[in-house]
C-alpha cells in the first residue's frame, strides 16, 4: 500500500513544543511518513530529536546553518513519498488529529 500522507515538520528552536507535537503526530493512525527538518536550532531541539525520535520518525534533516522555513521545506521535498503532503508547524497551531478530515476532503475533489 502506498503511503497516504507525508508530514513535513520544519523546526527552529522548538524545544518547548516539538516533543508534544511529535507524540501527537506519531499517535495519529493515518498511514504517514514523517520528515523533520531542523533549521540549525541552538536550544536543545537538535539533541532531543536525535536522542528521542531518530528511530521513530522516517527522516531527520539537520541544516548546518539557519536557512529559513522555505529552505527547510525544500530540503524535505526530495524524500516525499506520500500521496498528500502537509507542512506541520511545530508550534501546534494545527492539530494532527485533523489529518483524516483534510485527507477526506482532498479525496472528494
Could you say what each language-model-derived stretch is?
Residues 1-109:
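Structured catalytic core of nucleotide-sugar glycosyltransferases
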Amino acid at each position: 500500500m502506498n503511503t497516504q500522507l507525508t508530514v513535513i515538520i520544519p523546526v527552529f528552536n522548538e524545544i518547548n513544543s516539538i516533543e508534544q507535537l511529535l507524540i501527537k503526530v506519531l499517535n495519529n493512525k493515518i498511514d504517514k511518513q514523517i520528515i523533520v527538518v531542523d533549521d540549525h536550532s541552538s536550544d536543545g531541539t537538535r539533541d532531543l530529536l536525535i536522542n528521542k525520535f531518530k528511530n521513530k520518525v522516517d527522516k531527520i534533516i539537520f541544516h548546518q546553518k539557519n536557512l529559513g522555513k522555505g529552505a527547510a521545506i525544500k530540503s524535505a521535498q526530495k524524500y516525499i513519498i506520500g500521496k498528500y503532503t502537509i507542512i506541520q508547524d511545530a508550534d501546534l497551531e494545527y492539530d494532527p488529529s485533523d489529518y483524516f478530515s483534510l485527507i477526506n476532503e482532498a479525496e472528494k475533489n
